[in-house]
Structures are given as C-alpha cells and as structure tokens.
C-alpha cells in the first residue's frame, strides 16, 4: 500500500472521529457512511477502519495521554482539534508500524 493511501485513510479517520464526536452516532454507522461516500480505490480501508474503531474504543486512554501536553483543559479543545489529537495519539500508542518522523 502506498503512503498516500495511508494519508487518505488518516484524513478520513479524522473526519469520522469528528462526526462521531458531534453526532454521537454508532461508530459503525459513521464508518459505513464514509466508505459509501468515498472512492476507496486509493484508500487503505483497513487502516482507516482500525484507526476509527480504535479511537472510539480507546478514547478515554488517548485523552488522558495527551492532557499533560496541553496548555488548556481538554474540555476547552475544539472538536476538530480533539479529532486530530485522538487520531494522532492512537497512531503513536497503538500503531507501532508507523515510523516516527
């Protein structure tokens, strides 16, 4: 899989996490809707699914992991920023195959 496919998966995962935070809909419904709307030809679908599901399951742990590095209370972080932080923290904590850059 090309690195670009992972970048697209990561971007779609951030959209999915944001949608989940706003709507409170089941993560499976959000995943299904995003995959229906997206051209998956150049997307690493498995990576997208792992991130999206992983963030939904592990968000309390991820939130606690990033809190010490914030300059304001976690509750004051914008939902877009929270989605990015959660996806990033998930990759750093659980996706050991992602190289550090």
Describe each region flagged by the PLM:
Residues 1-101:
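N-terminal interaction/assembly modules
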């Amino acid at each position: 899989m090309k690195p670009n496919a992972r970048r697209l998966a990561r971007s779609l995962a951030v959209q999915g996490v944001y949608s989940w935070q706003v709507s409170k809909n089941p993560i499976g419904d959000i995943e299904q809707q995003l995959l229906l709307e997206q051209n998956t030809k150049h997307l690493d679908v498995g990576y997208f699914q792992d991130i999206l599901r992983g963030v939904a399951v592990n968000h309390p742990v991820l939130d606690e992991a990033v809190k010490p590095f914030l300059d304001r209370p976690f509750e004051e972080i914008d939902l877009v920023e929270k989605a990015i932080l959660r996806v990033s923290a998930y990759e750093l904590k659980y996706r050991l195959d992602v190289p550090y850059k």
